[in-house]
Amino acid sequence: MAQTLAMTSQFNGRKRVRKFFGKIPEVTEMPNLIEVQKASYDQFLMIEEPKGGRPDEGLQAVFKSVFPISDFSGTAMLEFVGYEFDLPKFDVEECRQRDLTYAAPLKVILRLIVFDVDEDTGSKDIKDIKEQGVYMGDMPLMTTNGTFIVNGTERVIVSQMHRSPGVFFDHDKGKSHSSGKFLFAARVIPYRGSWLDIEFDAKDIIYARIDRRRKIPITSLLMALGMDASDILSTFYNKVTYERDGDGWRIPYSVGRFKGVKLISDLVDADSGEVVAEAGKKLTVRAAKALAEKGLKAVKITEDDLLGSYLAEDIVNYQTGEIYLEAGDEIDEKALKILFDVSADQINILDIDHMNIGAYIRNTLKVDKNESQQDALFDIYRVMRPGEPPTMDTAAAMFHSLFFDPERYDLSAVGRVKMNLRMDLDCPDTVRILRQEDILAVVKMLVELRDGRGEIDDIDNLGNRRVRSVGELMENQYRIGLLRMERAIKERMSSVEIDTVMPQDLINAKPAAAAVREFFGSSQLSQFMDQTNPLSEITHKRRLSALGPGGLTRERAGFEVRDVHPTHYGRICPIETPEGPNIGLINSLATFARVNKYGFIESPYRKIIDGKVTTEVIYLSAMEESKHYVAQANSSLDAEGRFTDEFVVCRHAGEVLMAPRDHVDLMDVSPKQLVSVAAALIPFLENDDANRALMGSNMQRQAVPLVRAEAPFVGTGMESIVARDSGAAVSAKRGGIVDQVDATRIVIRATEDLDPSKSGVDIYRLQKFQRSNQSTCINQRPLVHVGDRVEKGNIIADGPSTDLGDLALGRNVLVAFMPWNGYNYEDSILLSERIVADDVFTSIHIEEFEVAARDTKLGPEEITRDIPNVAEESLRNLDEAGIIYIGAEVQPGDILVGKITPKGESPMTPEEKLLRAIFGEKASDVRDTSMRMPPGAFGTVVEVRVFNRHGVEKDERAMAIEREEIERLAKDRDDEQSILDRNVYARLTDMLTGKIAVEGPKGFSKGKKLDNTIMGHYPRSQWWQFTVEDEKLQSEIEALRRQYDESKEALQRRFMDKVEKVQRGDEMPPGVMKMVKVFVAVKRKIQPGDKMAGRHGNKGVVSRILPIEDMPFLEDGTHADIVLNPLGVPSRMNVGQILETHLGWACAGMGKKIGDLVDLYQETGDIFPLRQRIENLMPDNDHNEPVRQYDNESLYKLALQMRKGVSIATPVFDGAHEADINMMLEDADLDSSGQVVLYDGRTGEPFDRPVTVGYIYMLKLHHLVDDKIHARSIGPYSLVTQQPLGGKAQFGGQRFGEMEVWALEAYGAAYTLQEMLTVKSDDVAGRTKVYEAIVRGDDTFEAGIPESFNVLVKEMRSLALNVELDDARELIAQRVLSDTTEQ
C-alpha cells in the first residue's frame, strides 16, 4: 500500500476514464480531424510567411501567373511585388452577430514601369518606376474550427474529388461495335485547357479529338506538329532491309520476328541453302533461339513472301526524279513488277507482322487526305472554329494555343508527374505544357495496348482521383477574377496618360472581389454548415464530394464511380455515404488519412524491416501502396514484433492474398484506419451488417444535443478525440491556474509560454444558449474550479453534446427486447414516462425571428409600441420601444416586435373619418405589420439584438443592450488588468525584497534594506521609485516597467476599439433603417411521433409513452425505460446492438458494485476493497489509466464517476469479444446469458421466458414531430392559379388530388366535389361569397368559375385559339325563341 501511494498520480475528475478492450497498441497519433481544411487554406493564404519569401503556391502563384501585365503598345508594364493582409475589422463573434463576413483586407504591392521606346531601333529604356499598395477587396479568413463566416452564417467548403490530370488509357469494353471488339482510347486531361482524345475505330484507324469535337486522323495531328509521312513511319516502325538473292530475297534472321510464327513455307538458310525448319511447323521461342545459337544469320524468302509487306521508303528514279512507289505502299503483284523493272537490289520494308506489330499508323496515313503541315493545320482550324476561313498564321497560332501555350494550357505538377510515371518519361514537373514527345509517347503506348502489350488504367483507382481542397478551389476562383481584371487593366493602360497615373488608378478590384464573393456565397461546394452536433460539424469538414463544378453529375455517374474500390482502404470510408441519389458520390475521409501536396489521399503504414515490425510510420498514396505487401493491423505478432504465422493475410496490388511472412514489408497502423470518424464511433461495428452501419453512422450526425449530455457506457475511445478536435469542448491554450470561473467565462492566469509581448491572462468566453445553423442550442459549461491547475490541451469546459470532454450524442437507457401489445410493431418504440419526467431526451431549440424597418415610398416604417387596433393585453410583453422583453413566454400569434407601415391614401369611409377626428392622423395612415410568433411555435425569449443604421437615433432598448455590452467589456479589461498588476507587482516584490535602496519615494530614508513591511507603507504605484545599487537589476526593473506600461496601454487600446465598434452604427442592406432580431428558445420534450435511433442503424418512431408503473420491471423493481421489438434484429443483421446491450448491462452492474463499495468507504473509511475492485477492473496496459498510481482522493473521485456505470471503450475491429462480455457479466454477478426474468407492470406476473435486458445508447434525431405537424384553415393562395399553397413552410393546405376526386365521384358526392373544386379552392368570387354568407349566418352560396379554368383559357389564347365563355341559359333561351318564331 505504501509503495502504491509513493508514486501517486492525480486524477481531477475532469475527464472520463474508460476501461479499454483494445489489444493493438496505437503507434502513431491520429492527425487532427480538421487538418484537411486548415492546412489547405493556410497554404493558400500563407499569412505567416514573410512578404518577400513566399513560395510560388496558392495566392502568390495566382498573382505571378497573371502579372506582369503590359499595355498593347509595350510602353508600360505593371508588375506584382507582393501582398499582405491587414487585421480583420471585426472578430469572429462580432461577424456572427452583425451578419458580416469574417475577412481581412488584402493589400497588393504593385510596381508600374514606364518605358521610353526608340521608334527606330525598338529598344526600351526605363523612364519611370512607381510602386504602390493597392486594396484588392477582402479575403475571407478561416476560423480556428475550419469554417468560414459569410454574412453571419457558418459555412464549410467541401473538398472535391475529381479525376487527376495526366494521361489515361482505356477501352470501351466491346460495347461500341456490334462485333464486341475492344476499341482502345487514350485521353490526356490537363488541369486547365483542351482535352486530347486519341482513339481507335472499328477498322483500326487511329483518330484524335480535341475537346470532344469532330475526329481527325492522328497523322493529321502529327503533321500539324511538323512531321511528314516518312517521319511518322520511321518513328513508329523499324525498318528491315531486304536484299535480292537470285530469284528470292535475303532478310536478316531475328528471334523476335520469327518466334511463335507458323511457317507457311520452308525456312531456308540464305548462306547454306539448307532448310532449317519445314513449312507448317510453329516456331516456339526456344526453337527460334536455338536456330540463332546455331549461327543462322539470314534466311531466304521467295517473291511471293514479299506480297502484303509495306515499303519503308519511296522507290525513286534518281535521274528523272520520278517516284515509282511511295513509302507505306503495300507490295502487290504490280509493285513486284515495278521492283523487277527498276531492278532494285535492296529495299527497306516496314517491320509489320500483323501479330506483334499492327499496321495501324500506316493504314491511318493512307486514309488521311492531308499531305502537308498546312493542310493539317487548316483541317484542325476548321474543326475547332467552323465557318471561319483559315490563314496559315491564324491556324498555326490557334494550334499552338491549344496545347503549347502556358497561358491556355496547364497540366499542373500533378499531371506532369502522373504522365512521367505512366509513360516512363523524364521531364521536370515545371514543364506543364504538352510536348511533341508526350503526344508521340501516348500514341506509341496506345498502339502497344492494341498489340496486346500493357494494361489499361482503372479510373476509379484513388491513384487516378485527387482531392481539391479549399485552398485550391479558392485559387482557381481567384484566378478567374484576376483574368477578368486583366482585360480591364490593359484597356485602361492604353487609354490613360501613363506618365501621370499610379498603379491604384489602373486597378478596379471589383471583378476579383466579386469572384471571391460568388464562390463563398453560391458555389455548389460552399455549403451551409451542418451544425446539429459536434460530430456533424466534423464530418461536414471531412466530406469529399464528386459533384460540383468540374465534377460529376448525379444523373451521369454510373455504378463503378460510386462503388467501393480496394484503394479506398485507409483513405475513404467504405461505410459512411448518404442513402439515395448521392450514394457513393459523397464520401468521408478515413480517420488516419491525410491529403498530400499533390492532392492524393495518403494512409499511414508501419514499416517492416528484416521481418520485424517497427514503430516507424510512413504515409503512402494508392499508387505507392500497390507495390507493397501490406499486412493487417490485427496480424498476430510475437514479443519482438515478428509475425507468428508462416503465411500472413495481406493486400497487394488491389488483391487480398496469403503471402509468406518474409514478403510482407508494411503493416496497417490501426484497425480503425479504414473507417471514418462517424463509423469509428459505433461499438461492435464488426458485428453489424454494412447497410445498417451506414445508417448508424449517418444518423449519429442527426442527433440533437440534449439538455443533459451523457457519454455512452459502451464507447470506442474515439469520443474524446471528436470532442476535442471539433472545438465543441473548450481546451486550454496554455498551462496555468484558474483565476475566475462563472457560467459565461473562465479566466486563467498563464504559467507557461509567458511571452512579454502577449497578455499573461487567457480569458475564455463561453457560448451561452447560442443558435446553431440547425436551430439546435450551443451552450458551454465550465468544468474547472477557481485554483485548479490546468495543463495545455486540458478540457476546461463542455460544449453541446459533450460530457467531461467525451462526445455525448444521446443517453444510456435501460432497454428490454420484447413485444408489448403491438406498440413496438414495425420498429416503433415504447417509452417510459420517466424519460419525459426526468428530461432524459429533452432538447432546447432556438428559433431566430428577424424584422427590418425600411424606408418605403410612402414614408419610413417604424418599430414602436403604438400599434393601431391592438389590445393592451397583446402589448403586455413589449417595452417602450415596441420590442419584447427577454424572458417573456410567447405563443402563436404573440407580437415579438411592434411595427407599423405607412399605407397609401384611399377614400375614407364615415367610420374612418370619425376615428380620424377622435384619434388624429395616426389611426388612418398606417397599418400593423408587427412580427408575430408563427403557428405552432411556443417558447421563451432568450436574446434580443437591435441594429441601427449610421446616423439613426438609437431607441432606449438599443442603448440598454449597448450599455450591457460595454460593462461586459470593462469587466474583462479590469480582470485582465488586475491579474497583470498582481503578476507584475509580485515580480517587482521578488526583485526588490532584501535589496538596499539608494533612492525611494518621498519620506524614504536611503540605504535601507527593503522588505514587505517597508514597501507596505507606500502605494504600489510608488514602488517603481525605489532605486537599487545593482545596476543590472535596476535595468531589469526598468524593462519590467516599460513592458508593464506597454501592456496597460495595449489593453486600454483594445478596450477602446471594442467600445467604439459597439457604439458605431451598423452596416445595413440598402433601404433598411433598423433591424431587430429576437431569439426564442423552445424546450422540446420527447413525444409520440419523434424519431429515435441507436448507433447501429436501429431507428424507430416513438409510438406511446407509458406510465412508469405499466412498464415491465426487473426483480428489484427497476422499470425498463424503453421497449424495443426483438424482430428488428435478425433480418437487419445488426447484432452489434445486442452485444452493446449486454456490455452496457455489465457496465451498469459493475457501477452498482463500485457504488456499494463507495458507500462502505464513506461509512468505515476503508478504501482497500474499492481500490482492489477498480484495479482488477483496469489492468495495467498501454491503453488504461494508471489507477494503481492514484492516491486515495483521486481513486475516490474516479469511483464516484463510475458508480452510475463503468465507461468502457471497445474500438472497432479490435473490441471486446464474447468471452470478454461474459467475464464482465460474471464480475458484476449477472447472468452470463444477459437475460433476466421480467414482470408485467400491469399484472405483476412474470413473463413466460427470460428477456434480454441491458443498457443501450439511444439518440433523439432531428426529425421532430413538432417541426412536421401542421394544420391550416385559411391561408395564402398562389397568385396565378389562386389555389392554396402546399407545405408547412408556406402555411399551405392538404392537396385534394386527382385520386381523391375519383373517390368522391365514386360515392356520387356531387355537391361536396363541386365545393372542393370551387369555393374551397380557386373560385375567387365564390370564396368571398361563402365568407359573407357565413358572417350573415346563411348557408346558401353559389359556385362560380374556378380560376384555373381562366388560366387554361389564357394559355389556349396564347396558342392563338380563341375561347369565349357564353351563358348557357341565354343560349337555350335564344334557341327556344328562334324555334318558336320559326313555327
Curated annotation (Swiss-Prot):
> What broad class of enzyme is this?
transferase
Concerning InterPro entries, the annotation shows: DNA-dir_RNA_pol_bsu_ext_1_sf, DNA-dir_RNA_pol_bsu_external_1, DNA-dir_RNA_pol_su2, DNA-dir_RNAP_su2_dom, DNA-dir_RNAP_su2_hyb_sf, RNA_pol_bsu_bac, RNA_pol_bsu_CS, RNA_pol_bsu_protrusion
What GO molecular functions are on record for this protein?
A: DNA binding; DNA-directed RNA polymerase activity; ribonucleoside binding
Q: Where are the transmembrane segments?
A: none
Q: Name one GO cellular component term.
A: DNA-directed RNA polymerase complex
Protein purpose: DNA-dependent RNA polymerase catalyzes the transcription of DNA into RNA using the four ribonucleoside triphosphates as substrates.
| Similarity section | Belongs to the RNA polymerase beta chain family.
Q: Which named protein is this?
A: DNA-directed RNA polymerase subunit beta
What is the name of the gene encoding this protein? rpoB
